[in-house]
């Protein structure tokens, strides 16, 4: 069986994309079915033919602006049947791009207010 060619794409201006992207990559590297490539903070990766070799994109990106060429590259690639996994801040990417937000199925508005709460460990096993 061929491995799933997977692009781990991390970047943006708010979250620690380097640390989190590396962690995502390391976790996924334990899956023998995946052939991984990592790209950090380079939106040209979303332009065809750069996405063409991949079957799956694991997307950890925050905020930013996407050009029409990048948007069309990503949306057409997904529409062709390829896989998109948006991680955490993916819903807060490309705020001014309604087509991207429609593909993701929603968007980030705000974090709730911080508050104190109690955690009870019932069963540590």
PLM regions: where:
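Short secondary-structure boundary/capping segments
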Residues: 48, 76, 109-111
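Short catalytic/ligand-binding loop motif for oxyanion handling, primarily in non-cytosolic enzymes
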Residues: 16-17, 46, 66-67, 92-97, ...
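Aromatic-Pro/Gly-enriched surface loop or interdomain linker
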Residues: 1-53
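A generic structural signal for well-ordered alpha-helical segments
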Residues: 28-29, 77-78, 100
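Short alpha-beta junction capping motif
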Residues: 8, 51-94
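An acidic, glycine-rich "communication" segment
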Residues: 2, 90-125
